Amino acid sequence: MFACAKLACTPSLIRAGSRVAYRPISASVLSRPEASRTGEGSTVFNGAQNGVSQLIQREFQTSAISRDIDTAAKFIGAGAATVGVAGSGAGIGTVFGSLIIGYARNPSLKQQLFSYAILGFALSEAMGLFCLMVAFLILFAM
C-alpha cells in the first residue's frame, strides 16, 4: 500500500503523511508544522489533514473496543474478588466443624471453644465482606 502511495503522491506528501502516522493524535492535531506553510505547502497541509482525520476516525472506531475491554476487565476483577466470598463460606464451615469436633473430644471446654468459634466466624466473615466490598468497588466505582 505504501508503494502505491509512493507512485501516486509527491514525496513531500508522503513525508507529511508518514509523520502524522507515527505521532500521537494530540501531537498531530496541536502542533502541525505543515499548517504554517503557504502556497506549495497547501497540498502538504491537505495531506496531513486527511491523515489526521483518518487517525481520528480510527481512534473513534477503537474506543468502543477499548470500552468493551475495560468492561470485561471489570467483570473479571469483580468475579475474582467474589471468589473470596466463597472462601469465607468455606472458612466459616471449617470453624464450626472444628467446634463440633473439639466439643465431641472434650465437652468440658464448651464455653472456651464456643468463644474461639465466634472469633473465627467473625474474622472469616469480615474477610468475606471485605472481598464483597472490593467486588462492588470494582464494578461501580471504577
UniProtKB/Swiss-Prot annotation:
F-type ATPases have 2 components, CF(1) - the catalytic core - and CF(0) - the membrane proton channel. CF(1) has five subunits: alpha(3), beta(3), gamma(1), delta(1), epsilon(1). CF(0) has three main subunits: a, b and c. Interacts with TMEM70 and TMEM242. It is linked to Dystonia, early-onset, and/or spastic paraplegia: An autosomal dominant, highly penetrant movement disorder characterized by spastic paraplegia and/or dystonia to varying degrees in affected individuals. Cognition is not affected. There is high intra- and interfamilial variability in phenotype and age of onset. Some patients have onset of progressive focal or generalized dystonia in the first decade, whereas others develop progressive spastic paraplegia as adults. Some affected individuals have manifestations of both disorders. This is ATP synthase F(0) complex subunit C3, mitochondrial. It comes from Homo sapiens. The record marks 125 as: Reversibly protonated during proton transport. The lineage of its organism: Eukaryota, Metazoa, Chordata, Craniata, Vertebrata. Keywords: CF(0), Disease variant, Dystonia, Hereditary spastic paraplegia, Hydrogen ion transport, Ion transport, Lipid-binding, Membrane, Methylation, Mitochondrion, Neurodegeneration, Transit peptide, Transmembrane, Transmembrane helix, Transport. The chain crosses the membrane at residues 83-103, 118-138. The keyword Glycoprotein does not apply. Its main location: mitochondrion. CDD domains: ATP-synt_Fo_c_ATP5G3 (cd18182). There are three genes which encode the mitochondrial ATP synthase proteolipid and they specify precursors with different import sequences but identical mature proteins. Is the major protein stored in the storage bodies of animals or humans affected with ceroid lipofuscinosis (Batten disease).
